[in-house]
Structures are given as C-alpha cells and as structure tokens.
Amino acid sequence: MDVPCPWYSLLIPLFVFIFLLIHHCFFTTSKKQNMLLLPSPRKLPIIGNLHQLGSLPHRSLHKLSQKYGPVMLLHFGSKPVIVASSVDAARDIMKTHDVVWASRPKSSIVDRLSYGSKDVGFSPFGEYWRRAKSITVLHLLSNTRVQSYRNVRAEETANMIGKIRQGCDSSVINLGEHLCSLTNNIISRVALGRTYDEKESGIEHIIEQFVELLGIFNVGDYIPRLEWVNKFTGLDAKVKKVAKELDMFLEIVIEEHIIRKKKEEYTSTGEAKDFVDVLLEIQNGNETDFPLQRDSLKAILLDSFAAGTDTTFATLDWTMAELLRQPRALKTLQDEVRGLAQGKSEITEDDLKNMQYLRAVIKESLRLHPTQESLLVPRESMEDVNLLGYYHIPARTQAIINAWAIGRDPLSWENPEEYQPERFLNSDADVKGLNFKLLPFGAGRRGCPGSSFAIAVIELALARLVHKFDFALPEGIKPEDLDMTETIGITTRRKLPLLVVATPC
C-alpha cells in the first residue's frame, strides 16, 4: 500500500534547489565584483580618476592612499588601475604573484620609440622578452661584464675631477652639469664604444627628448576616443621626429662598428668590448639560439644607453643635494672616505669595499628619491588573481607600485622624511628590492637589470668627489633653503641646477 507523501516534504528539494541557486549566484557575483570592494576615489565620466594625478603623480597618489588606504582602485579613463603603496602589496605583486603581473600594458608612444616595444623594459611578457632579457643579463650586464668596464669608470671620473678643479677658479660651479657629463660619457663608451660630441651628433638633446617622451602620460592609451588630441598638440609629430633621429644615430653607430670589425681595428686600446660589439657578435654568431634582428638590437641599446644615463645622473644629483643640506652627513662621509684612502692620491674601486657609510648614503638617497621610477613602470595582470589573498583582480588590470610612498612609509621607517644614512648601517635593506622596503630598481622579473652597473658608477663618483673637494652652497644660501623641487619624466629629477662652491683639498 502506498503511503501518501506529506505535501510539505515536496518543498524540501525545492528549498535545496533555491539554496544552491542563491549560493551560486551570490558567490559567483561576489567573486566577480570583489574588485569593487577595493577603496576607490569617486571617478568622473569618461576620464575616471585622471584629474587626480596632478603634476607630480607619485605625490598625488600618496596623498590619496593616506585617505583610501595602501591598496586602492583607480580608473584611468575606463581602464582599472591598482595603486599599491605598501610593502605587503608590493611583495604580493612582485614576488607572490610575480608571474601573473609580469607583463606590461601597451603604450603607443613606447611602441613607436622602441621599435614596437622590443626593448627589455617595456616589452610585454612572453618568449621574446625572456630571450631579450637573457641577452641583457648574461651578456651585457653580468657581474663580469660590469667589472670589465672599471677602467672606463676610473678614467671618466678622473676627467670629471680635473674639470671641476679647473672650474674652481670661479666662485660657483654647476655640479649638475659635471655629473651629467660624467654619466653620459661612461655609458656612451660602455654601450657605444666612444663618446659623441654634442655638436657633432646632437645626441644629448635627442636622448633628453626621448626620456621626456617616455614619461609623458598619453591620454589616448586610456581614452581611445581622445587619441586625435595628440595630433592637435603636436605630440605625434614630436614622437615621430625623435624616433627618426634616434634611429639614424643608432644606424651610424652600428655601421661604424661593422666597418671597424671588417678592418679588424678592435682591441688596439685594450678596452673591453662595448655593448654594440657584443650584440653584433650575438647577431652573427652562435652565442644564443635567438635570432637578434636589427630593430631588437637597437631597442636593447636604447634601454641601456638612454634610460641608464638619465637615472644614474639623477641619483648622483639628488645625493649631492641631500649631502649639502645635511653638512653632518657630508662630514661623516668625507671622514670615512679620506680615512680609508690612507693618503692615496686616487680612490679605486677596490677601496670602496669597506666604505659602509658611502653605501648607506646612497641607499638613503634612493629611499627618498627613487629616481629610476618613483612610480614603478606599470604592470599588467595576465590572468585573474587574488591580491593579498582577498581582492579578486581580473586579467588585464594594471598595477602601479608607488616606490616613493613605500620609501616614506612610517610603518617601515622611523622619521621617514628625515635624511639619515645611519638607518642603513645595520640594516638588511638592499637596493635590489629583496625586502620590498627599498625599491629604486623595482623587483622580481621586471626589476632593472642595470642596478649593479649604476651603483658601481655612483659609488666611485661620490667617493672621488668627497675625497678631492670640500663642498658648500653659494654664499647666502642656507642648507635648509636649497630648492629640492622635482620634475617628472620617466625619472624623477631635481628641477633646478645644483650650484656649489668646490674647494680642492
């Protein structure tokens, strides 16, 4: 005999079905919309949060992070951008999920200047980038290769010291000009094989424009409907002109090397092979299984030559400015350098090994002024990812790490606004970003491969400067009155020239 089923028992599977449906809809929707839970300033139609970037974006974003938190969501036009201003968020992006965030967003200006983004710094993640970076790391900027250029660094710093000594007859010198000339000459000899006279080639002006263009915010990349503005403002024409001039210059350099190779006029000076030599050997030989095309060769050269010159100079300029503002730190550095030099007429790179305060000075300058990138070059997620284990971030989202803000975070640094090199004397903080508190060269897969070369130039130049001269500000300028106004491009420079009085020791 069949027992009638109570009517309410029929509701059980209905309730189960409704529960599962609600559970699925709620959690699926929640997962997709979790990014909306990120703190976010109110955005405007079309432009999003672009109006909040200001003339100094690293400072504007730092101010916003103080209100909305160390991880926040902005929109540049319609594109979502995560801004990270904390050690934890930086570590999550550049270490925990480094592979996911290893690509770069497309930039139309960079594309046109670097042969379709065939350089290492801006190339999207993939097999081409792996091969290009491998060439840079193993063949151009290995520790062995960096050491092979020590004679170039020694000769050019000695030349700079001589020129400053000649200029001491006048009461005031422009130290910034000497520092800029130093870095230009060193990197030109290392990358291109010789220095190029500005009147002969105009290369310094071309490179200055190149670096300026790399730092321009191109609204067309974020609001495609406004791409026409670049033609109206003349930006498109300027990019085209600079790209053409750079290409013509690099072609001349490469052809010079090819002709010299045919005549077998190499090594007569005993100098190490320059970057063009190495890249041409790779192109023509079997050192790698990577077919290095002409455009790729030129793009890789641009990375090392153009970007390296500007950032190294800016770091030296900021460091000397900070030391002039802090006479006590300058005196401590001079005492260390002169004491360890032990009466030697010339500082060598071997003498630098025991100069702990020198390294602390450089780290402190890079903490306050991460000239390579106050805002690290944007990364782009290649797939969905959970940020800090909580926020679900969709693929193709950009991430900007505010290295300037992290270097001034009171949770990581005591008295963060004060210049105190002593904080690094017993610290494990490294300029290569291993603990993510100090990020002047980025970190992870997209970290700058030229950090060792840059530090080698900076250390020797600073040591020789404070060994040979006493420095002071011009009469009437107090240390606290030295103008430290910034100007922004792909690097963060001081805006005004560094004028000093140099007295030979």
UniProtKB/Swiss-Prot annotation:
Its cofactor is heme. SUPFAM superfamilies: Cytochrome P450. The keyword Chaperone does not apply. It is an enzyme of class 1 (oxidoreductase). This is Cytochrome P450 71A2. GO terms for molecular function: heme binding; iron ion binding; monooxygenase activity; oxidoreductase activity, acting on paired donors, with incorporation or reduction of molecular oxygen. It is a single-pass membrane protein. It comes from Solanum melongena. Belongs to the cytochrome P450 family. Keywords: Heme, Iron, Membrane, Metal-binding, Monooxygenase, Oxidoreductase, Transmembrane, Transmembrane helix. The keyword Transmembrane applies.
